Amino acid sequence: MSRKKWRSVVIVGLLASLTSALMLATTAGAAPKAGPTVIVGSKNFTEEYILGELYSQALKAAGFSVQYKQSIGATEVIDSALTSGKINVYPEYVGEIDQTVFHQKTLPQTAKGWWQLAVKLNKKRGITVLNPTPFFDVDAIAVRKADATKYGLHTVADLKKVPNASVGARPEFKDREEGFKGMQDVYGLTGMKYVSLDQGLTYQALDQKKVFCIDVFSTDPQLASGKYVVLKDPKLIFGVQNVAPEVSNKLLTALGSKAALLKSTLNKVDAKLTQKAILAMNSAVVNNKQTPKAVASAFLKANGLA
């Protein structure tokens, strides 16, 4: 064999050895596959953005492959996304499950009962409802403090005292029993005008007197300003609204032995979500202009969940 040919053989052999070594090193150093992707969804308002980030980041920290789809839409829209497989996890309000999704007319008298009903109803369609949060966030009707004093407003029914009153709320609130329809049917507010507004514009519309009252959430940080009065709902038309993760059973099956870890991770997050905690995070985003991602990250780290 000539020196030239011998050198070529040696070089080819060295290259082959080097390639094999690199392939082995790459394989050995590669992270193990995380299994099926967990697709977390959220609705289109601040509190849901925060909840979506909390779930997504906690699951990533636990080793899951996670995709987060923010601002999918209202209950009817995001529920459809869950049942169709476009997402497989999202935070939902228990009252929304019982009333908006399943249209239940006869409802339990306790928060635990509402959650148990949601678990039972969802089981029939292949969805698991995990543990509820300590905090609750119900729809409520708020008015300007000056108007509450002027008209002597204490309950939703008192709005009948106000001539030509209008309520501003998100579009889907209009036809719900736990919304404007319930206000008309239960409290007799048949003459009230409905003004459809984007959720983010309701307080602005109230401040500018474009509407007399608005639909709010009981954990809205704006309510701490003292500018508004939340009217009591003695008939409980707005229901019980603790939050619980809804998880597709198809995802749980695909995860196999890791399904238990997903459940425990989300349950640990929910267990930390007190009224004080969610109000602080909502305020950090709305008033302090922090991002939901940053707020969620700080909360998870402070509680040993990330």
Task: Please place each PLM-identified region on the residue numbering.
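Periplasmic-binding protein-like
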Residues: 126-127, 133-140, 219-267
